[in-house]
Amino acid sequence: MQRLSTESIQSFDAGSTSADGDARQALGDDGVVCLRGAFEASWLSIVEDGIVAALAGASVDLEVVKREGDKGQFSFSSGAWQTVEPFQRFIFDSPLADLVWPLLDSSTLTLFYDFLLIKEAHSDSALTPWHQDHSYYPLDGTKVVNSWVALDHIPLESALRFLAGSHSSSTLYRAVDFDDPSAAYRHARSELPLPPINQDDRILVTSLQPGDMLVWWSHTLHCAPGNRLDRRRAAFSVNWLGDDVTYNGQPALDTYIDPLLSSGDHVVGDKFPLVRQSVAPNG
């Protein structure tokens, strides 16, 4: 992965009553923000219970990859909340939704999907290439965010990197095939290639402690290195939709598709439940 000069992601204390406005501004400016100390150890323990269940077969969309030459494997699971009860508890009962919702400037908050990723010790080749999440989604609109909760201490050398401000134009780039970034992705929505990432660009990164949470817009370009550490590097992320998002029905992975929705529909239903909604004033 190319070495680039970096700046720190703007960070705020998740427990501060004044953090919402500042964090929302940082997210709007840079495309990513960090909320420190978002979750206590008791909530992380619930996620760990979910990991045990998911790896034991409760997740119907679990993949385990061990690349040639790596000592460790890379495991990931998508859309497991309906079959992994501890994940469901974390998503609906923890402070998660109430931390994320104010950042969207939206009258609603809808659960899109969850994503578990575990890079075991010395999964050196399990890097994540530069990409944007939105290019994989059958969605129109801009209020789509990923809330990414660190389960381990993540030092700078294994942390996510973000291209500051890359969300601002809502440009949709060509989706990247993670197994072979040079290959065409099967569900590509755009043929516009990713812009070159240069030394002059503002690359944002920060180390994380367990319970810290990154939040970024789905149009924000980001990447991550493999895990060269002697220990696990794991996170549990939950993706959310705001009130301007509609379904467009384009081909995508099953996790993102609901056959009960039609093009132009607001994305809500049993698969994508409404979690928060503003109460309209009387009269």
For each of these PLM feature ranges, what is it?
Residues 107, 134, 142, 150-160, ...:
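Active-site region of the double-stranded beta-helix
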Residues 1-30, 36-130, 135-137, 251, ...:
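Non-heme Fe(II)-dependent double-stranded beta-helix
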Residues 1-13, 60-65, 69, 173-177, ...:
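Non-heme Fe(II)/2-oxoglutarate
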Residues 96, 106, 121-124, 153-156, ...:
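Short, charged/polar surface micro-motifs in flexible loops or helix N-caps
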Residues 107-109, 113-114, 126-128, 143-149, ...:
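Generic beta-strand structural signal
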